[in-house]
Swiss-Prot record:
Family: Belongs to the tetraspanin (TM4SF) family.
Pfam families: Tetraspanin (PF00335)
PANTHER family to which the protein is assigned, alphabetical: IP01817P-RELATED (PTHR19282:SF521), TETRASPANIN (PTHR19282)
Chief subcellular location: membrane
SUPFAM superfamilies for the chain: Tetraspanin
Topology in membrane: Multi-pass membrane protein
Any one cellular-component term (Gene Ontology): plasma membrane
Entry superkingdom: Eukaryota
Function: Facilitates synapse formation.
Protein name: Protein late bloomer
Keywords in alphabetical order: Membrane, Synapse, Transmembrane, Transmembrane helix
Amino acid sequence: MGCATTSVKIASIVLNAVLGFLAAGAIGWIAYNADTETEEFVIAAYIACSLILVFALLGIFAAIRESVVLTATSAVFLLILAILQIVSTCLFLHEFDVKSGRDMVEVAWQANNMDSLQQKHECCGQSSAQDYIHLSLLIPPSCYADLQQTPDHLYLDGCIEKVQSFYESDKLRFIIVSWVLVAFELICFALAVFLAISFKNKQRRMEF
């Protein structure tokens, strides 16, 4: 096996490993943010990232074993995954509306269920702590950092602004992660095609 093929083989193993780690990280990120997304999105994202992880591992195994069939299989499925992900990401960009932070906070406010939002997003009230004061209510402990009810630990930002910012950042993170995964999938696909051809040529030379 030539130096070029050896270099590509090593690069393929490394990049597939990186792709696998990215997919595993994406699964962890989805699990952490599952409560902020629709059930359909979470299930689809789990399936997609799990498939990416499986075929990244297959790519590593195929390169190590120098298997033409496994390398070609890995290449085909990585290309299919990349195409599907490009289509889904483009649809997401054009059709997905960022969730309304105002709606989320207003529902929690009406249900008197602000504590989890205030602690998670480090905010207080709908617009500020004044929302409680205007209603002659005590500012709840969840409005304070580490639940320490002192003025210097009070969260100053309102939850509508913080939750909306979280949703917008969440969408941006998803888009970035999605395009990074697509880039790695396409690179690993190209390397797998090169390796499949190289392994096939090696087999032919060994037959003579």
